[in-house]
Amino acid sequence: MDATRFASSPVGRLVPLRGTDGRTGQPYDHVAFVPDPLPNEPPLAGATWRAVSRASHALGRLHQAARQVPAPALLRRPTLRREAQSTSALEGTFAPLEDVLAADLMDESARSADLREVLNYVDTADAAFGWLREGRRVTIGMLCELQSLLVHGTPADTPQAGHVREIPVAIGGRSDSIVDARFVPAPPGPELGAGLQDLVDWINSSGRAGRDPVVAAALVHYQFETLHPFNDGNGRLGRLLIVLQLLQDGVLTDSLLGVSPWFESRRAEYQDRLAAVSADGDWDGWIRFFADGLRASATDTAQRVHALLDVQADYLARVRAAGIAGIARDLAESLIAYPYVTVSAVAERTGKTFQAANNAVRRLVELGILRERTGRTHWRFFAAADVVAALIGPISAKEDW
């Protein structure tokens, strides 16, 4: 870390960091950055407030769109898996979205290590959203539980999993060395624990303090990333925290929003903007960038939700026109959540016989709704290509829908 760049930071301070690097075995005498407690709201330029307003408007439209969805659980599944794939990719864990969507059909032994790690994020986010619905607030204990779920079964699943870290960590750089790192967060110990407690208290006072929710989410994400309180999973948890805070503050009522695809496509600027806050106190540049990301993400999510609902309506119209009801109709309705199916999976999910499920799948194939992907006679694999395209493909750039 370039200590000279952060030496005069107006939002934090450098502290000594000495020890022996456990990865390289080399002693180091370096510094780490400890952020100050968050301000209530930093002064922002007019252009930044306009970006914040546009983000708030887009979030409001997503909120309204979610309220109009008759079965939101069907949409939570694909949108969360899309977010899981993208937020993991930002951290160097890659699994094709098609595999993430079809993972329930695979034997666990057939899943790659990367795919298992992406699915950990799905479980982690599901738990977090469920806890908020139960009325739990964000606490250090909750964050520790979430981190433990996130790293379960991975190399980071050590005795330290689920605990605030007790070792130094380094972010980026040419090697694993702390000295070569792009950024070195706060060292372990009382200051890190106090900083995390201050952040949690700030999150839970945000609504009462009358802070703008978009600005608050930007500040919280910066602070969490800068503290880096865990040995692993900080980036993914930090992006999950954006959605958790918007839900806790009542800006959103459903967890459909995915923020990572936008940040993933701008990874270098994302990292640079965070660093510029620590080095120069550039809240304005970070919050404007963040607000642009929230606006684009909310707009994209809402447009994909509408695209999925359009696909569902088209499927149901085809089924009605063919005079089909029962299990085939129910299957057509559920494809926006489960775009990859096998006959066995349909039978298990519906509680019907294998033959009934097979007949339903065959009828949807005849209608062009499902397509067989394997070319086999046993363990045939089917896909709803229109649903996959709505999740993966380009989406209209128009703002009004």
At which residue positions do the language-model features occur?
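FIC/Doc superfamily catalytic core
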Residues: 1-401
